[in-house]
């Protein structure tokens, strides 16, 4: 895709289809085309951690029928261009493998094609396209998927730490991903304020 950048595009605004002039998490629908802009990165998604409220809502709506749950997840992604549950207004996290890196992507972590990564930002704001949903792991509210997602410069990607199971990593980052980022930023005598609910 061509370069045509303004200062909000590192947050993914050019991927917004509707409504116009909002950030991706607030959009109803995103452009999830596979081709990337020069400052984007594409990830081959292998597993998704659904936010627990979303997982429960989908499960109840589908009568705990896993075939229906798979179709529902695919339907949400097809209609919205992202895995953003319209009932609960929540997303989740993803794990996958770096597939392509744009030439202008701000690659501070020096990621390479083939690196395993966890996206430490909600799927509510990330363009994604899934072709299939596989195994469902109810204990962790996670599903195996085949497909891809597009990340922007301001989306935090974390190289998978060795020796820790993916299901536990996704679960932990879903619960305390902000604290992980704070641990990297809170150096010296910096003052950090964490605002949220259900922290304890």
Please tell me what each predicted stretch does:
Residues 1-26:
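N-terminal intrinsically disordered, low-complexity, charge/repeat-rich segments that act as generic
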Residues 21-33, 78-81, 94, 177:
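Short linear interaction motifs
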Residues 34-49, 61-124:
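Glycine-rich beta-strand-centered segment in the early N-terminal region that forms part
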Residues 92, 116-191:
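NAD(P)H dinucleotide-binding glycine-rich loop of Rossmann-like/cofactor-binding domains
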Residues 177, 198-200:
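Residue-level detector of alpha-helix initiation sites
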Residues 192-198:
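Conserved N-terminal Rossmann-fold NAD(P)-binding element of oxidoreductases
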């Amino acid at each position: 895709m061509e370069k045509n950048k303004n200062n909000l595009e590192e947050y993914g605004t050019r991927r917004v289809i509707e409504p116009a002039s909002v950030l991706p998490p607030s959009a109803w629908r995103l452009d999830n085309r596979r081709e990337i802009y020069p400052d984007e990165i594409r990830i081959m998604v292998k597993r998704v951690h659904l936010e627990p409220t979303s997982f429960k809502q989908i499960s109840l709506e589908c009568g705990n029928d896993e075939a229906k749950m798979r179709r529902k997840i695919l339907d949400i992604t097809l209609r919205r261009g992202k895995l953003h549950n319209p009932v609960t207004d929540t997303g989740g996290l993803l794990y996958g493998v770096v597939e392509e890196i744009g030439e202008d992507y701000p690659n501070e972590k020096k990621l390479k094609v083939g690196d395993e990564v966890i996206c430490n930002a909600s799927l509510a704001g990330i363009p994604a396209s899934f072709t299939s949903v596989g195994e469902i792991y109810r204990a962790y509210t996670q599903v195996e998927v085949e497909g891809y997602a597009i990340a922007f410069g301001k989306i935090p990607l974390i190289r998978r730490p060795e020796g820790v199971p993916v299901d536990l990593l996704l679960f932990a980052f879903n619960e305390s991903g902000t604290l992980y980022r704070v641990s990297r930023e809170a150096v010296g005598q910096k003052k950090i304020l964490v605002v949220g609910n259900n922290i304890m």
